[in-house]
């Protein structure tokens, strides 16, 4: 609970910095504040409890995922200084919004009451609507903001309807009371209908098939840093929340729900990777890649043991690789209307360090050994084999092979084609973020138990 309070206070401090004309200090102060909050959050790992009549719950799940969210936010805030260099008068707004977005993320994995869950998801969603349309002079950004707002509002409405049905069936928003009632009596059909509505709404937020159609256009039109936020932080927050909802509200999974999860996972893996093969725009490609990774993460709901730790590890590997990827993409595609693969031509010769980092990030997402992306998929598929979901394992392997095709399109462009443009000097912060993210990615691959043993 204190973590959420400190994050909210830091967001207010970021906004106040503008009043005192301390724009240059906003990013450093925010990063230091986030690192301090990260340390405090870790200290709560073994101090479990609930607050405000169980509105907020501190447990190992919430602490572990909140720590991951804080780390990703540190990277995003660090990238903000250079990305918003031409909009210095608004940097406090953008940084403040990212911090408030983090507060919504923490609330979404720490809730003990469905009303707090909905409050968290709205704080996160509204922050993203603003960031998606933040480039007011760009029509694509305006379009992305409007599409994301409409689709997000639709998903929020479905989630709220599901919560209402659950409340109508149980008479409570409190998860503990709902769980006690589930174990002591049979529920009317609308309780399970409410769970299905919750599932549909969260799948919209995660962008899985068949609720994915908004993602490519929104990712392409949004500013690159906002796309990075959506595809890393927002996606893993929604996935962690979905996991908590399903495991708490359905302590014994129904076979019909499992079939829905299997169909969504398989369709997302296949369609995401097949559609990514056809893309020439890097952000659209990453949108479809994210859909396929969402399919992998959704399949953790089928596991009977070590599901939470597997999801945490996969989310960590995916998000950190995504940060390294976008640190390079933001530099290469700066001031370009279209972020095509041709923009990366010759990067291996002109900027070998960035090319190497981008290559490693892409290989990690493809599931190539040594990097953490490989171990994330390996641990997940190994657990799926034990639960006898062999069809999901087979499709996951096929889709991983397909993904190599479009990831290598970028790698080939970097190392085999000549550059058609002269790029400016690489901002130091982009290099630092990319290098640190890559080091964390490799460390996760070499020492997976550090994360796997947290849950």
From Swiss-Prot:
Q: Does the keyword NAD apply?
A: yes
Give a single Pfam family match.
Proton_antipo_M
GO MF terms held by the record: NADH dehydrogenase (ubiquinone) activity; NADH:ubiquinone reductase (non-electrogenic) activity; quinone binding
- Presence of keyword Membrane: yes
What's the protein's topology in the membrane?
A: Multi-pass membrane protein
Transmembrane feature ranges: 25-45, 61-81, 99-119, 149-169, 193-213, 257-277, 285-305, 312-332, 355-375, 391-411, 432-452
Q: Where in the cell is it found?
A: Cell inner membrane
The organism's place on the tree of life at top rank = Bacteria
* Catalytically driven reaction(s): a quinone + NADH + 5 H(+)(in) = a quinol + NAD(+) + 4 H(+)(out)
The UniProt keywords, alphabetically, are:
Cell inner membrane, Cell membrane, Membrane, NAD, Quinone, Translocase, Transmembrane, Transmembrane helix, Transport
Cellular-component GO terms for this entry:
plasma membrane
Q: What is its EC number?
A: 7.1.1.-
Q: What class of enzyme is it?
A: translocase
- What are the disulphide bonds in this sequence? none
**Chief location of this protein?**
membrane
What biological-process GO terms show up in the record? ATP synthesis coupled electron transport
**Which residues, if any, are the signal sequence?**
none
> Could you say which protein family the record assigns here?
Belongs to the complex I subunit 2 family.
Q: How does it assemble?
A: NDH-1 is composed of 14 different subunits. Subunits NuoA, H, J, K, L, M, N constitute the membrane sector of the complex.
Question: What does the protein in this record do?
Answer: NDH-1 shuttles electrons from NADH, via FMN and iron-sulfur (Fe-S) centers, to quinones in the respiratory chain. The immediate electron acceptor for the enzyme in this species is believed to be a menaquinone. Couples the redox reaction to proton translocation (for every two electrons transferred, four hydrogen ions are translocated across the cytoplasmic membrane), and thus conserves the redox energy in a proton gradient.
What protein name is recorded for this chain? NADH-quinone oxidoreductase subunit N
């Amino acid at each position: 609970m204190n973590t959420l309070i400190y994050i909210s206070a830091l967001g207010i401090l970021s906004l106040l910095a503008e009043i005192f004309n301390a724009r240059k200090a906003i990013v450093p102060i925010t990063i230091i504040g986030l690192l301090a909050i990260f340390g405090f959050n870790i200290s709560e790992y073994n101090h479990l409890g609930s607050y405000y009549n169980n509105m907020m719950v501190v447990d190992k799940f919430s602490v572990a995922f909140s720590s991951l969210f804080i780390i990703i936010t540190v990277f995003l805030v660090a990238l903000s200084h250079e990305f918003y260099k031409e909009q210095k008068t608004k940097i406090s707004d953008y940084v403040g919004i990212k911090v408030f977005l983090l507060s919504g993320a923490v609330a979404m994995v720490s809730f003990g009451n469905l009303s707090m869950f909905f409050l968290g998801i709205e704080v996160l969603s509204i922050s993203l609507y603003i960031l998606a349309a933040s480039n007011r002079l760009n029509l694509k950004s305006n379009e992305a903001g409007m599409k994301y707002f409409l689709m997000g509002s639709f998903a929020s409405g479905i989630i709220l309807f599901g919560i209402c049905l659950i409340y109508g069936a149980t008479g409570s928003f409190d998860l503990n009371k709902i769980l006690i009632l589930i174990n002591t009596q049979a529920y009317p059909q609308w309780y399970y209908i409410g769970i299905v509505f919750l599932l549909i709404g969260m799948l919209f937020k995660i962008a899985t098939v068949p609720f994915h159609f908004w993602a490519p256009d929104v990712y392409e039109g949004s500013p690159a840093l906002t796309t990075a936020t959506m595809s890393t932080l927002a996606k893993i927050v929604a996935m962690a929340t979905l996991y908590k909802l399903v495991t708490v509200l359905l302590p014994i999974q129904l076979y019909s729900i499992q079939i829905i999860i299997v169909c969504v996972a398989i369709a997302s893996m296949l369609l995401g990777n097949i559609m990514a093969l056809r893309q020439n725009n890097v952000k659209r490609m990453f949108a479809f890649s994210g859909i396929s990774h969402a399919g992998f993460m959704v399949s953790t709901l089928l596991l009977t043991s070590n599901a939470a730790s597997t999801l945490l590890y996969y989310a960590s590997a995916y998000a950190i690789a995504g940060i390294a990827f976008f640190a390079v993409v933001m530099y290469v595609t700066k001031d370009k209307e279209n972020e095509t693969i041709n923009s990366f031509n010759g990067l291996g010769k002109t900027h070998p360090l960035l090319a190497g980092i981008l290559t490693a990030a892409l290989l990690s997402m493809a599931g190539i050994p040594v990097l953490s992306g490989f171990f994330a998929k390996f641990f997940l598929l190994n657990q799926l084999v034990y639960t006898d979901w062999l069809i999901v394992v087979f499709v996951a392997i096929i889709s991983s092979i397909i993904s190599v095709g479009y990831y290598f399109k970028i790698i080939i462009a970097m190392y085999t084609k000549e550059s058609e443009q002269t790029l400016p000097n690489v901002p130091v912060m982009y290099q630092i973020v990319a290098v640190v993210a890559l080091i964390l990615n490799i460390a996760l691959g070499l020492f997976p138990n550090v994360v796997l043993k947290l849950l």
